[in-house]
């Protein structure tokens, strides 16, 4: 039987990702190829006649239409995920809308907020400037708010605001059309934060789940951004991970990630993924109380993927 070649796939060639992101994804693809006894063929080329349908390692979750055109029909066809709409791959789905008449894109699930419940922090997703300001007003009653671009990664594209003037400074430059399509998240701001990474990877019938903590560093703009994770892995799914967790904070992070995972898959049934990762924040609210909640999902290769593949090989 001809083994399926492994290829990397770039979703948007107009966007230039960081060099370490490209190199990291190629290294993951090469390891996956070796593990599968197949060849790594570099970036996918639509003009090439592959000996067998490729196994894809994309740089982002794929919309279902594009996935089908590439021959991706199940989670076994890629290291990553497939979504019914582009916004479903972002942190937009973490929160509900701030009011009943708020605007939302086609395919938006109002059930997600109900399903996920208190597994997330207090916050809202907005697809218009007016809705975003309404969300900010409500959250500022409880202290500071964090405004987050839905497509931001690694902690980028975020600003903490303390009043409406600061909020306007952040929101005014936003493009209305992009806001209507992609949205913006307004969320309570936490201090003294620890961020857990909880994930599940399935490759070739093998399942690996893990929980770890993230490390951050200040970038050139003075913002805290992701710079790596330390993870503990177990064979099996989230149930095995929950049984393995010894510390209370780890068990809680795993439980919240499982609830978010179930809510997302139930609310957006077109999602399938071989890599499902969830960031869970634990920190202090402005009133000093401990707050814990899932920040976002990642259904694409990420910063921990190199370790994930090595662990599943072990």
Language-model regions: role of each:
Residues 206, 252-314:
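ATP-dependent carboxylate activation and anion-phosphoryl transfer catalytic cores
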Residues 94-184, 202-205, 217, 229-262:
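Active-site nucleotide/adenylate-binding loops and adjacent lid/helix of ATP-dependent enzymes
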Residues 151-152, 189-193, 270-275:
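A short catalytic or substrate-binding loop motif that flags glycine-/basic-rich loops and adjacent residues
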């Amino acid at each position: 039987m001809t083994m399926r070649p492994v290829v990397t796939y770039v979703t948007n060639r107009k966007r230039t990702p960081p060099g370490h992101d490209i190199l990291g994804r190629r290294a993951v693809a090469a390891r996956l190829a070796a593990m599968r006894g197949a060849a790594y063929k570099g970036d996918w080329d639509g003009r090439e006649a592959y000996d067998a349908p490729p196994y894809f390692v994309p740089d982002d979750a794929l919309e279902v239409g594009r996935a089908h055109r590439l021959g991706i029909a199940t989670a076994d066809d890629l290291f990553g995920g497939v979504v019914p709409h582009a916004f479903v791959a972002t942190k937009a789905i973490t929160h509900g809308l701030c009011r009943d008449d708020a605007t939302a894109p086609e395919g938006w699930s109002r059930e997600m907020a109900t399903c996920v419940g208190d597994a997330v922090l207090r916050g809202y997703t907005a697809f218009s400037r007016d809705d975003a300001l309404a969300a900010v007003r409500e959250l500022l009653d409880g202290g500071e708010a964090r405004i987050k671009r839905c497509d931001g990664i690694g902690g980028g594209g975020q600003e903490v605001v303390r009043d409406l003037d600061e909020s306007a400074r952040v929101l005014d430059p936003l493009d209305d059309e992009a806001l209507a399509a992609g949205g913006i998240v307004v969320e309570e701001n936490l201090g003294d934060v620890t961020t857990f990474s909880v994930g599940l990877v399935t490759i070739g019938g093998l399942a690996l789940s893990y929980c770890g903590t993230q490390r951050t560093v200040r970038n050139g703009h003075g913002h805290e951004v992701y710079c790596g994770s330390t993870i503990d892995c177990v064979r099996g799914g989230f149930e095995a991970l929950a049984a393995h967790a010894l510390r209370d904070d780890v068990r809680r992070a795993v439980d919240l990630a499982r609830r978010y995972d179930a809510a997302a898959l139930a609310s957006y049934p077109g999602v399938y993924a071989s890599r499902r990762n969830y960031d869970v924040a634990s920190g202090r609210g402005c009133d000093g109380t401990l707050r814990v909640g899932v920040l976002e999902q990642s259904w694409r290769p990420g910063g921990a993927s190199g370790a994930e593949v090595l662990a599943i090989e072990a």
